[in-house]
C-alpha cells in the first residue's frame, strides 16, 4: 500500500502565540534557533534547570523568557504550542499528556507518535517562505531539500512578489476575475520552453 503525507501545512503568526520549550540542551537550542530564525518576533518561554551558552545568547538577542526549573504543568498556562526536548522520556510523555488534556498542540522532539506537529525544513527569501516535511520520517532529507531550494531560488524572488502585489492592486473585477487575470499573467513563470 502506498503511503502519503497527510499533514496539513499551515503558516502561523508566532508573534500572536506563546510558545513553551521544555529542556535546555542541544535539541532545545536547535528548536529555538530555527523558530527565531523564521519568526524573530515569536513569544517564547523556555523551562529547564540549565541552559547551554548558545541558548543563553539567543535568549538575550531576542525576547525569550528563561525559567530555571524542572517541568511543572503550571507552566502550560496561557501557552499555545509546546515543544518537549528533555533527555528524560518520562518527562516528555508527561508533557505530551498534560498538553493533550489542555488541548495544547505539542511536539515531543524525535518522537513522532507524540507530535501534533513537526518543525520541518524552512526556506525563506524575503516574503517567500517554503516549508518542507517528510512526515517525521527523515529530518535529514528535509534539511537537504531546504539546502537545495535555498540554492535554486533566486535572491531577488522578493522583487517578483512585490511587483505582482502592486500589479494585483490595479486589477479590476470580482475575485474570480482577478484570480484569472493573475493566473494568465503569471503562467509564463512555469511554462517550459
Enumerate the language-model features and the residues they cover.
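Glycine-rich, highly charged phosphate/nucleotide-binding loops
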Residues: 60-77
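A short, basic/flexible loop-to-alpha-helix module at the beginning of a structural domain
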Residues: 1-14, 119-120
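An accessory alpha-helical subdomain
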Residues: 136-193
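Residue-level detector of alpha-helix initiation sites
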Residues: 26-27, 90, 136
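ADP-ribose/adenylate-binding Rossmann-like module
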Residues: 81-87, 92-118
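Glycine-rich adenosine-cofactor-binding loop
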Residues: 10-33, 163-175
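E1/E1-like adenylate-forming module used to activate ubiquitin-like modifiers
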Residues: 105-158
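NAD(P)-binding Rossmann-fold cofactor-contacting core
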Residues: 30, 38-58
